[in-house]
């Protein structure tokens, strides 16, 4: 495993699971079975003392414990995330698992993804977990408590300083969970900046094709890994067999997908930002049309923060948000676009746009979240421009 662990991430994505291959197939086969035969030799029938600890990547028994597709998926993720990866049936199932593991009395969390707050509400109902703002005084937190930091944050796409929040948490004996969904491997390594647990909604960039649900936790501590496995067996929150295979297939192209989408996004942000900053644009020009429709734009690349280039040295993510001049513009723009699907979620190969209020009623009703895909960026630019122009003509 050492040569693979020392390899480039693109190589790891293709070979980190080679040692788990049980067949001669080059492409990993789809294992759908939920049960596996015991040995025929009675002498090999040994009652396990600890099925989790004794799993060797081959002695499968029941898929709620371990399954071939998910095990290979987790092997690649462990290499890419630089920690022990555990997969779940959804991102929120993964977050629930993290909070079950740590069992904090208090949690400090920002606005971010509304689903995370729903999980916190369930935990609070069961355990009395208290929720505080992300920037609450450090003195509120105690030993074993949690800061849940989403960066870049949903839906804006802006970033927070992971190291700053790690120091805050650790100064109080608390833990830092980083939701790095918007900053997949290749863009951001939260462990490098002090994260204790890294969390991803794998439905996004790990799946990458808008066709699977998945959640992932990565940890450094062996005792946490074992407890996560044990809890997953007890709660039955495993990723499905087919989803495990789909996730493995998709990880093979993770780096090239994320790079292309991030480059596309950077070019579009640069164009829109320049247009919005042009003084006294000529009526009818691109700059005039953009300014007539857009009021504000959010993306990590627009932040002038000295720490950000270190935290995200290879790009700032393919998701950004725009605030339009009025709510009617925001509701109408998606219907004017040809190459952007009006749908929720993000991280797929196709570009998406969402009037975000449909998913999260608490956000600004003039806000649209944009997830950039793998199309040619100039086609996306032309599509946005024609849609903006159409809105100005109808207003």
Task: Tell where the protein language model's regions lie, with residue ranges.
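Conserved N-terminal alpha-helix of the aminotransferase class I/II PLP-enzyme fold
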Residues: 28-30, 35-101, 112-124
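Conserved C-terminal alpha-helix-loop-beta "cap" of PLP-dependent enzymes
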Residues: 15, 19-20, 281-368, 372
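Hydrophobic side chains in well-ordered alpha-helices
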Residues: 73, 228, 329-333, 380-384
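N-terminal amphipathic/basic leader segments beginning at the initiator methionine
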Residues: 2-48
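Short loop segments at secondary-structure junctions
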Residues: 35, 41, 219-224, 251, ...
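Conserved PLP-enzyme active-site core in the AAT-like
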Residues: 2-6, 10-19, 81-292, 298, ...
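PLP-dependent enzyme catalytic core of the Aspartate aminotransferase-like
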Residues: 83, 105-108, 114, 122, ...
